[in-house]
Amino acid sequence: MTRFGDIDQWYRGVYAAKKVGFSKIKLNVVFLKGFNESEICDLVAFAIDNEFDISFIEEMPLGETNSHDRSETQFHSVDVKSNICKQYDLIETLERTSGPSKYMRVVGTRTRVGFISPISDNFCNLCNRVGVTADGRLLLCLGNENSVDLRSVVRNHPGD
């Protein structure tokens, strides 16, 4: 949820959003074998306790990473779902968001659990997403590193 960031800052932001009345908060978690797989059910419990939705995302093989070897950390959505089902009952839902997430509901709660599976269940034909990186680059495809530098556009055309 923060990668290598400040988890306390993350908590403050999430609780501030809840406090001011955001009614639909969704947590996005990239899961990695050997890093955070043991936290999956704790994160679902946190989402349930706060009536948040949560989506688990398979890591996309984009960019360089020095923090881990992707071949050793790849963890598929079916494995995450299996871990969750050991502790919670999940049911299929017909809800669609026009996005890549496939949702299930935790029985007896308001929480939806989504699975975004670019590796194990390619969704390119259904994707309607673009991304903005932390350094202001617009990614027209989440699976491609070609991008547009939004920061320079905004700085060079501040009134537009």
For each of these PLM feature ranges, what is it?
Residues G63-D160:
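Accessory C-terminal segments flanking Radical SAM cores
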Residues M1-I57:
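Radical SAM/AdoMet-radical enzyme domain recognition
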Residues M60:
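Short, charge-patterned binding micro-sites
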